[in-house]
């Protein structure tokens, strides 16, 4: 998570070049690279921009994740304590030391801030009550989010198999009609949210990876089959496969950060998900929103587990409330687009679901278990939360911190 990565390799499942850098089979074709082994193109993703973004947004996880924040090694040993009494760790790989969090000290002000967010108190009342200006509120929210992430990172329960659902959604910011792009991954058995990522970077990356579109890709009315096929058609029309248009997104001129293309947070997001869960489980099933770069991020983070058959990935679309036992007629259809994947659609009077098992079992009974229920549940929780009007008036940085705390509130109510 803290070491640099390069993801410019073939992402075709079953291809011998999957995950292989600089293969002799690769031929550059403009912004893409052709893999002559499988015949598919994959877009070039800037190694510099991806690692800049990862290093910036992962900074708040230093000491929370048991990895060296300098080189990413897990070969560590205890190395005494700091002057403040915090555990110090030594990295065998790079000979650096760092502070490992064993507890986080909160403050009465931060405790009161957390309570006011939970109750949906307005931003003006929070600032007046806690005597916070814009800078002070930003600092307190960052600390509150770090405290929440620390607590959540130690709450996982071991399980032989887990299913994780991932969805994308949008939240307004700065009191405008601009949107932040957000990914959320939740564990299906318990409903707990594992991780949240946004496309806001506190510092700028390469200009080419700044999100600049004001257009929104929209789905016309229709069945899930039509939506799947329409999504593939929209993806094919993009200048680059990962150049999604999710709506307008402009920052204030005095904001030092950047809204990056969603491909960067997608690749970082699944790294975080895997690090937070891999110690507690053996086999993982990922259910994903239908989006090519979300699949790419999941593939990169779980490459070794996919090769060993311990990780499986499916695209899922659903509408309505899933019944306890899905007894529905199913039919196969092709998605069209670049890959023309085979999907299976299930439908009842009140519920419909379409699934594409990219790896793993193709049995109908196994495919019936596919769902995005837990990720959708958290999105609905955010959209109904009394603090949402205040979130919509915050800066993107504060929105990201507040969502991390809402994740903690959501998980706490499930305990």
Locations of the language-model features?
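Short, flexible, mixed-charge glycine/proline-rich loop motifs
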Residues: 1-9, 25-29, 54-65, 80-85
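Short, cysteine/histidine-rich loop/knuckle motifs that typically chelate Zn2+
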Residues: 9-17, 37, 69-73, 93
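Short Cys/His-rich Zn2+-coordinating modules
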Residues: 16-27, 45-56, 71-78
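Short, positively charged, Gly/Tyr-enriched micro-motifs
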Residues: 42-43, 57-61, 65-161, 168-170
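A short acidic (Asp/Glu
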Residues: 138-140, 292-302
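RNase H-like nuclease fold core
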Residues: 149-277
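Acidic/histidine-rich, metal-coordinating catalytic segments
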Residues: 282-296
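Charged alpha-helix within mobile-element recombinases
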Residues: 325-414
């Amino acid at each position: 998570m803290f070491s640099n990565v390069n993801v410019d390799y073939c992402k075709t499942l079953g291809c011998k070049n999957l995950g292989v850098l600089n293969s002799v089979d690769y031929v550059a074709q403009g912004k893409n690279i052709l893999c002559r082994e499988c015949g598919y193109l994959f877009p070039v993703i800037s190694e510099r921009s991806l690692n800049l973004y990862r290093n910036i947004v992962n900074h708040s996880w230093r000491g929370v994740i048991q990895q060296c924040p300098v080189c990413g090694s897990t070969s560590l040993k205890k190395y005494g304590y700091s002057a403040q009494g915090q555990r110090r760790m030594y990295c065998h790989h790079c000979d650096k030391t760092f502070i490992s969090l064993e507890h986080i000290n909160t403050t009465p002000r931060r405790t009161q801030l957390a309570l006011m967010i939970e109750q949906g108190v307005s931003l003006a009342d929070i600032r007046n009550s806690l005597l916070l200006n814009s800078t002070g509120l930003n600092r307190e929210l960052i600390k509150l989010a770090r405290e929440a992430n620390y607590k959540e990172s130690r709450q996982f329960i071991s399980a032989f198999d887990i299913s994780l659902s991932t969805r994308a959604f949008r939240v307004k910011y700065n009191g405008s009609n601009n949107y932040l792009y957000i990914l959320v991954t939740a564990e299906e058995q318990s409903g707990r949210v594992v991780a949240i990522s946004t496309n806001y970077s506190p510092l700028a990356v390469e200009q080419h990876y700044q999100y600049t579109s004001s257009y929104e890709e929209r789905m016309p009315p229709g069945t899930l089959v039509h939506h799947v096929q329409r999504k593939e058609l929209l993806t094919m029309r993009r200048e680059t496969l990962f150049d999604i248009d999710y709506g307008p997104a402009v920052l204030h001129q005095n904001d030092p950060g950047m809204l990056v293309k969603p491909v960067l947070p997608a690749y970082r997001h699944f790294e975080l998900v895997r690090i937070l869960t891999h110690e507690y489980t053996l086999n993982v099933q990922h259910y994903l929103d239908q989006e090519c770069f979300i699949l790419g991020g999941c593939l990169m983070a779980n490459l070794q587990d996919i090769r060993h058959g311990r990780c499986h990935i499916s695209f899922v679309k659903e509408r309505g409330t899933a019944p306890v036992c899905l007894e529905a007629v199913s039919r196969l259809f092709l998605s069209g687009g670049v890959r023309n994947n085979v999907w299976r659609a299930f439908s009842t009077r009140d519920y419909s679901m379409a699934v594409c098992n990219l790896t793993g079992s193709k049995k109908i009974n196994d495919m019936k278990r596919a769902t995005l229920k837990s990720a959708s549940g958290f999105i609905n929780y955010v959209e109904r939360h009394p603090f949402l009007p205040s979130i919509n008036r915050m800066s993107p940085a504060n929105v990201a911190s507040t969502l991390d705390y809402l994740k903690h509130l959501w998980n706490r109510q499930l305990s």
